[in-house]
């Protein structure tokens, strides 16, 4: 054991990976619905490892923190700038005011309790579950004209305050918005009804809307032998597909075997006759059962041997950006193609007829390869799987953003700047938006973005925990249980105020009120709790724009809280 401890002291990089290993493992453990979460677990494990008196030198903490902030900005950039448009301004304005609440309430409570700068920053970071504040506030503290000992004391107490307040910040947010929120809107049953009403308004009832599906409802391809007298002496392919449409079934004829010959490219005017074998594509629940009408299903491996494709496409074409799903679906190039999923700022949004598709959205198409490829060209840029990240783009974005963040102005003799960390966030916002406009460069595959986001943050948190380890226990004794109660207030008050503001001032639809509030507080856990409570995905429609604004402002508040104290 002594040998292992010695090696961890000599090679502190191993201590970091020990912290990540144990932290991620504990963070995945759930007791009922409760989980510490990865970030808190990594921090606490880092504190334990730090008891071994391990010193981590060098810029490793800052490097990974900058990668994390750039990834955050890159992910939400398109939605942040989209919010500046007229239709996004109400949600953007709501998010900005909500974020002010999230700053002012912790600041007032910190002043009342007599907290120092580090305790206030930790309170903000934990109660609002915005881990990046730890780094941004720390950078700002390091620029203050105070003694090195005081700087160290402030920086060491931040993770203590964060750890104490983060647990309620996460679990409490989910409870406030998932349980208390619907009551503030008139009761859970009323909110459920409002969500169903919005679904019906946007998609004529999603469950019955042909051609739309959740990811669990895949497109399928089945072959049938025509036996129905409806075909008479022959019906064109367009006649059959129109018949399906009239019966609320968005099905397509993909292939035909006629007189023993397979027709791979079926035109709308192709005539189908009794005895022909046809391949139909569409939602599984509509395709299965057609033997009751067309004729018996046939197992024909040769007829069914053709490439089908699931392809994510980034929407960039001005002709479709801003259009409703129903409008896009009706376009000629969407023949044979279904929309399986829409992701916006990394969040799944409901695929409903009236859902508006924005530039930068990732739309997942399903169908035969040639039809999907044709549709992809008309929608935007096919985001085909790749293992390559454009590191030129990443490096340049962080460099330019960091240089901008390093610029400072002096107010009352105090240098004020975004810091390199805030600059990296701004760089990510701009470069993420730029990539949505010009998707041929700047690609960061989703797994790589996950690494930058999660590993970047947790590597930073691990080093913070290890550094704070020796003073953590004493710091915890100083802040005590009272900080937990203060943190609960700092979490709950802005959320309750946000729900009431969204309802009475901004007059958002009840289905969007909770989603907008969760987004402004960037609490994905609460969004899941809301959707589970109201039994609908519609709250996600209010989440994305407010999430982009919240993720930006709440991180910048790490600078502001230090200056206010």
Curated annotation (Swiss-Prot):
InterPro entries: AAE_transporter, Asp_Ala_antiprt, RCK_C, RCK_C_sf, YidE_YbjL
One Pfam family here: Asp-Al_Ex
Protein name: Uncharacterized transporter BF638R_1531
PROSITE patterns for this protein: RCK_C (PS51202)
TM spans (from-to): 14-34, 36-56, 92-112, 117-137, 157-177, 391-411, 414-434, 448-468, 481-501, 508-530, 545-565
GO biological process: potassium ion transport
Membrane topology annotation: Multi-pass membrane protein
Similarity-based family: Belongs to the AAE transporter (TC 2.A.81) family.
Keywords attached to this entry: Cell membrane, Membrane, Transmembrane, Transmembrane helix, Transport
Species, as recorded: Bacteroides fragilis (strain 638R)
